[in-house]
Amino acid sequence: MAGSTIPRRALGRILHQLRIQAGKTQLAAGLIIDVSPQVIGRMEDGIPVKVSGVQVKELLRCYGAEPETAEQALALFEEVKAAKGDPRGGWWRAYKDVTSSHFDHYMNLEEACTRLTTFQMTLLPGLLQTPAYRRSMILVKEPGRSALDVEREIELGIRRRVRLLEDHEFEMNVFLSEAVLRHRVGGPAVMAEQLGHLADIGQSPNVSIRVVPREADGYIGLVVGQFTLFEFPVLRHSGLREPPVVFVEVFTGALFFEDSEMIQTYRTAVADIAEVALDEGDTRQMVLDVAKEYSA
């Protein structure tokens, strides 16, 4: 389910374009509907704000929106309102005390997308981690974390996996460096369990897992580094589709890219990585073989 994130972003994009075409500043736009320029800016950025349908209509009128564009914008506004009533929306915010500052934005995208493609060189993506694997990584990064905080973060990971297992319209394509399988996280028993889980979940119809073997010659993934590409569905009422977003995480923060040329660069990288990755069957066999090594 797209929730309110994607229609909000699409509405903001339309309002921004119309305001620029009308030659109005955010201050001028705010005066039209009696809000601050900051509210206009947040609305255009797809951030939740308190505005009414009447105010949106007035902006569209003053911007000189064509009837078709105005109809699209109002349909998006109605989608945002409808999604706000979904009790499942933003469930992860209950864990904000144990997550990073960029996690809310990441989860908005994860919950809204229908296809997630990720390339990982060091660790398994969160959606595929077992509790023991996740617990080990939390304590490596933050050895002083309280037991309660650690368990809450693990609980969050378990809840995130529900969509992967139950929503078959959600597609996850995972490319892993072989090194991910061989980095010993938590010891042999933890890794054996983790790789067994990886082999099992890779058989789900909506999950594709492919490993780039260490024998692969130099390939673009070594230069590009780790990333996640989010792709979104067509919105039900407006018929619009939001452009993809690329997420890149670093040790001290994260970057979100929306520029179309940047997105195309990452799409090309996905295609190049796919050229050197094992197919799903050979990947599963490798995962099981490495799991046996840990169990020996």
Annotate the PLM regions.
Residues 2-13, 17, 21, 27-31, ...:
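Interdomain hinge/linker segments and adjacent boundary elements that couple functional modules
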Residues 165-169, 175, 181-296:
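C-terminal regulatory/effector modules of DNA-binding transcriptional regulators
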Residues 30, 48, 219-222:
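Short glycine-biased active-site loop of nucleotidyltransferases that positions the nucleotide triphosphate
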Residues 34:
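Conserved catalytic-loop position in the HRD/HxD motif
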